[in-house]
Each structure stands twice: as C-alpha cells, then as structure tokens.
C-alpha cells in the first residue's frame, strides 16, 4: 500500500512533510511531490493548489507516476453543519460536488454526465482507520464521518450554505 496525501495549500501539508522520512522529491505541473515514509507507511505528500481541477490533476499524477493505492485529501474546509465547531474533524463517508449542475441536459444537480452516481463513496476500511486514529490523537475534538461537499467557490452567503447543507 502506498498513500498519496493531497493538501491544496502549503500549511495543510507542511506538518506531514516535517514528520516524513523523505526519500525523494519530484516536480510536475508546478507541484512538488515528496515521497517517503510517514512512520512505516509509504506516502507521497503534495500541495496541489486550490480547486477541483488541480486536485484531479494531482491525483492522476499520483496514480500514474507513483502508483499510489489510496488517496487522502486533507486540509481546511468550510463549516456548514451547525453541530460542528472550528477544529472538529470530518472523515468523508462520501463526496458530492455542490457546484456541478447540468440540469438542462436532464441530469440531477451534482451528477456528472456519463456517470451513474451522484456521490463518490469513500473506502470503508480507510474511514474506520481514520476515525480511530483521529479520536486517539485528538480526543478533545469531535470526530465524525459524513458527506463532504466540494465546490470551486468560497461559500460566503447563508443562503448558499443552507442550500448545500
């Protein structure tokens, strides 16, 4: 197993890089891929840049160049669930795109043309490992598993936040 860990911004991956035993660095598409070990686990950590296109390109490079078996996206996110506080941890059970809408082509909001799914399910074993690990290292925080909504915009209005949630 080799895990690719993506963060959009440098502060989201800096601590991971500091904790790694680095074997090599590699640059492609203006991204620096840092390969090595985190504990005893082979990982590749990378700052992708903000946005779903950057994350998708980064993921493909991780698969093609580094043969990662799993991809984890880590970082800061907006807060829509009123039961959560800043700093709480959400492990995704599935992912939806809140800004994908091709309704005029007879697709449901969030559905990508050509795909039969509305949401992308996370790996059950990774969810369980992440929940256990997060609760061990941050017992003072609320740790939950739930749906994550992604979009290429900052949600700054309560109306949009309510619509997404």
Indicate where each model-derived feature is located:
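Short, conserved "active-site rim" segments that organize catalytic pockets and cofactor/ligand binding
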Residues: 1-20
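Glycine-rich phosphate- or other oxyanion-binding loops that anchor nucleotides, phosphorylated ligands
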Residues: 2, 26-165
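Short glycine-aromatic motifs
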Residues: 19-27
């Amino acid at each position: 197993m080799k895990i690719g860990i993506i963060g959009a911004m440098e502060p989201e991956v800096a601590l991971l890089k500091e904790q790694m035993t680095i074997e090599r660095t590699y640059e492609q598409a203006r991204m620096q891929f840092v390969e090595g070990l985190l504990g005893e686990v082979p990982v590749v950590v990378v700052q992708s840049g903000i946005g779903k296109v950057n994350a998708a390109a980064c993921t493909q490079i991780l698969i093609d160049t580094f043969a990662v078996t799993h991809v984890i996206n880590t970082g800061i996110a907006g807060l829509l669930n009123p039961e959560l506080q800043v700093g709480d941890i959400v492990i995704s059970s599935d992912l939806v795109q809140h800004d994908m809408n091709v309704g005029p082509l007879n697709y449901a909001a969030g559905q990508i043309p050509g795909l039969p799914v509305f949401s992308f399910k996370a790996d059950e074993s990774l969810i369980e490992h992440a929940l256990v690990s997060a609760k061990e290292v941050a017992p003072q925080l609320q740790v939950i598993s739930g749906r994550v909504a992604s979009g290429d915009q900052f949600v700054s209005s309560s109306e949009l936040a309510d619509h997404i949630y």
